[in-house]
């Protein structure tokens, strides 16, 4: 996998590329002779550093989606809020959606900045037991576009995993970009040695979303990433007055439930549409504290409990 040193030029091909040290973009780079010699194409020393840095993190969960716009980052934010409601748990949320970092907005942290200490980057805290890190904190404006090639994104992800000082953490939730790209390969490669519990895959009921989720599931199998389960988001609308459910996005091919049965993957639950979810993301507040008794909140709580049960069961299996 190609990677980019921090002091590399903008169009660096990456240390693992066959063009490393030879490309026109390499002219004048302080690393040119080292890259050209091939000494940087060996095992990445950062892998052991990441393993050591994350040794204090008990559970690591990736949140994936095959398609954008299905509520992946929304789920990541609410998963973090839900887990952090237990004050005895330390929770961390890492946003590696490099080109579309929405977590700062959803967590009410826009305008916050990252500070460096002797032990690494200090995350930004929402609550005493909920820490957040995102590339959005490194931008001068939330409207700035991140126009990076894959190798530079990989370098940023490596730096997040290696340099952020999370401390003792029970759950690290990693919000990824949609699809299967360089970022996903980087995260899986770096976390494979640190121990990753698995992935939660977010979808909506429509076939156009499910077909991309099937690709995501195949990706997980190929890279040996365990699948915790699938969450069907925007699954119907429950009227707050009459309590009847309407299918806004009808599951024309059986929805996530049939897909999970066909592919032998766990369905963690279905989250109904609720306009208050979008409102809470826009205002950066926890949906659980704002609307504690809504059907969506109850669904989230069930899903979060199933994720916790999976992680605890896996921990027992690993040590037995």
From Swiss-Prot:
Q: Which GO terms describe its molecular function?
A: 4 iron, 4 sulfur cluster binding; ATP binding; ATP-dependent FeS chaperone activity; iron-sulfur cluster binding; metal ion binding
Name the positions where ATP binds.
66-73
Q: Where in the cell is it found?
A: Cytoplasm
Q: Which Pfam families match?
A: ParA (PF10609)
> What Gene3D superfamilies would the database entry show?
P-loop containing nucleotide triphosphate hydrolases
Q: Name one GO biological process term.
A: iron-sulfur cluster assembly
Keywords attached to this entry:
4Fe-4S, ATP-binding, Cytoplasm, Iron, Iron-sulfur, Metal-binding, Nucleotide-binding
Region annotation (Disordered) ranges = 1-23
InterPro entries associated with the record: Mrp-like_CS, Mrp/NBP35_ATP-bd, NUBP1/Nbp35, P-loop_NTPase, YlxH/NBP35
Quote the record's binding site residues for [4Fe-4S] cluster 2.
239, 242
Binding site residues for [4Fe-4S] cluster 1: 12, 26, 29, 35
Q: What is its main location?
A: cytoplasm
How the protein assembles, per its UniProt entry?
A: Heterotetramer of 2 nubp1 and 2 nubp2 chains.
The record's comment on protein family reads:
Belongs to the Mrp/NBP35 ATP-binding proteins family. NUBP1/NBP35 subfamily.
What is the official name of this protein in its record? Cytosolic Fe-S cluster assembly factor nubp1
Q: Which organism is it from?
A: Xenopus tropicalis (Western clawed frog)
């Amino acid at each position: 996998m190609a990677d980019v040193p921090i002091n590399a030029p903008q169009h660096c091909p990456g240390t693992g590329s066959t063009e490393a040290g030879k490309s026109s973009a390499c002219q004048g780079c302080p690393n040119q002779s080292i890259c050209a010699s091939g000494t940087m194409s060996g095992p990445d020393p950062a892998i052991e550093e990441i393993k050591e840095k994350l040794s204090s993190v008990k559970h690591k969960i990736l949140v994936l989606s095959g398609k954008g716009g299905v509520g992946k980052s929304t789920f990541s934010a609410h998963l973090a809020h839900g887990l952090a409601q237990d004050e005895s748990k330390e929770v961390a949320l890492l946003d590696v959606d490099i080109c579309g970092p929405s977590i700062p907005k959803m967590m009410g942290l826009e305008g916050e900045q990252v500070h460096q200490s002797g032990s690494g980057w200090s995350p930004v805290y929402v609550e005493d037991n909920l820490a957040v890190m995102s590339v959005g904190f490194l931008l001068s404006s939330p409207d700035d576009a991140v126009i990076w090639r894959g190798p530079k994104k990989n370098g940023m992800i490596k730096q997040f995993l290696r340099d952020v000082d999370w401390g003792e953490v029970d759950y690290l939730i990693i919000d990824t970009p949609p699809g299967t790209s360089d970022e996903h390969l980087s995260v899986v490669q770096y976390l494979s040695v640190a121990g990753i519990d698995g992935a939660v895959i977010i979808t909506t009921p429509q076939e156009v979303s499910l077909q991309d989720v099937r690709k995501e599931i195949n990706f997980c199998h190929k890279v040996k990433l365990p699948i915790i389960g699938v969450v069907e988001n925007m699954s119907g609308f429950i009227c707050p007055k009459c309590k009847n459910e309407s299918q806004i996005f009808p599951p024309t091919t059986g929805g996530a439930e049939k897909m999970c049965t066909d592919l032998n993957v766990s369905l963690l639950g279905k989250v109904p549409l609720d306009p208050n979810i979008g409102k809470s993301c826009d205002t950066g507040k926890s949906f659980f504290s704002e609307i504690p008794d809504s059907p969506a909140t109850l669904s989230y709580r069930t899903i979060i409990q199933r994720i916790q049960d999976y992680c605890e069961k896996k921990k027992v299996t690993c040590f037995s």
